[in-house]
A protein has these predicted regions:
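N-terminal signal peptide c-region/cleavage motif recognized by signal peptidases
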Residues: 13-17
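Surface-exposed binding patches on compact interaction domains or structured appendages
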Residues: 62-98
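Extended rod-forming repeat segments used as scaffolds/tethers
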Residues: 9-11, 137
Length: 138
């Protein structure tokens, strides 16, 4: 059975015209995470943010179920497998809510995904997906 999570990055700019603020995502280690089909398997990606002013970052996923990072992978037949996502590098591990961050030359973030459901012989084979969205507001 193949399980994967596709990472999509979006930057949202909300800056003033008088001063051109700069904020960018750099050093993305992987745009697609692949989990093995074993219980508690993990996958992670990291990236850095450089901003010349204070900013906010928001993490969300297509299948997010709560603010603590519970989500699920889904296959083409809508069968679901639960996952848990965690953020490190931010001032909080909060999902679907902007997290204020100070201006920095480089702030490293890591998103870790863990399979929280044990696949069995009865688990339908297929490609299981979720999408992660990262928004920068500056």
């Amino acid at each position: 059975m193949k399980l994967n999570i596709i990472i999509l990055l979006f930057c949202v700019a909300a800056s003033h015209i008088a001063y051109a603020k700069q904020c960018q995502i750099e050093r993305l280690t992987s745009s697609q995470l692949n989990l093995s089909s074993s219980y508690l398997s993990q996958a992670a990606t990291s990236f850095s943010v450089a901003c010349d002013s204070n900013y906010a970052i928001k993490f969300n996923s297509r299948n997010l179920t709560n603010a603590t990072g519970s989500s699920y992978l889904v296959n083409e037949k809508n069968y679901k497998l639960r996952t848990q996502m965690n953020i490190s590098g931010a001032s909080a591990s909060r999902w679907n809510s902007p997290i204020a961050q100070p201006a920095t030359e480089q702030n490293k973030f890591v998103v870790l995904v863990q399979l929280m459901e044990r696949p069995t012989a009865l688990t339908p084979a297929g490609v299981y997906k979720d999408s992660l969205y990262i928004n920068l507001m500056f």
